[in-house]
Amino acid sequence: NQKMKDKVLLVIAKQHDKIVAAALNFIGNDTLYGRNWGSIVDIPFLHFELCYYQAIEFAIEQKIKKVEAGAQGDHKIQRGYIATSTYSCHYINNPSFTDAVKNFVKMEAKEINKQIEIINQLGSPYSNQNN
C-alpha cells in the first residue's frame, strides 16, 4: 500500500531562493536508483553533490544497502562506485532502424563488458585491499 511519493527522492539545489538544479532518485527495497539530473546553472561539482554525495548520505541515513548511480561515467569510479551493467528498454517504431540499433547494441555490449572487467580488476579506490 505504498504511495509513489514514498519511493521518490528529489534532491534540489537553490540559489537565491530559486531552484537551479535537481536530481531524481527512486527508492527500491534495498537500493536507491539515481536516474535524472538537470541544472540551469554551471556550478563546479554541483552534479556530484546532488547526484552522488546527497544520495549516498540519504542511503546511509535510511539504511539502504546500495546506491545505483545509473549508466555511464568513469568519474563515478573516483567516487567509490564500482562498474556494473545496467539495462534499459526502448521502443523504436521503425523496423530498419530497430535492426541497426540491435546490431550496434550487440557490438557495444561486448566492449562495455570488457571495460567493466578491466575497471573492476583495478578495484574501488575506497576498498580495503587488506581484507
Language-model segment annotations:
Residues 1-44, 106, 123-131:
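A conserved beta-strand-loop-helix scaffold within acyl/acetyltransferase catalytic domains
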Residues 13, 21-23, 55, 59, ...:
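A sequence-composition feature that detects small, non-aromatic residues
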Residues 29-95:
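Acyl-donor binding region in acyl/amide transferases
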Residues 66, 72-131:
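Terminal substrate-recognition subdomain of acyl/acetyltransferases
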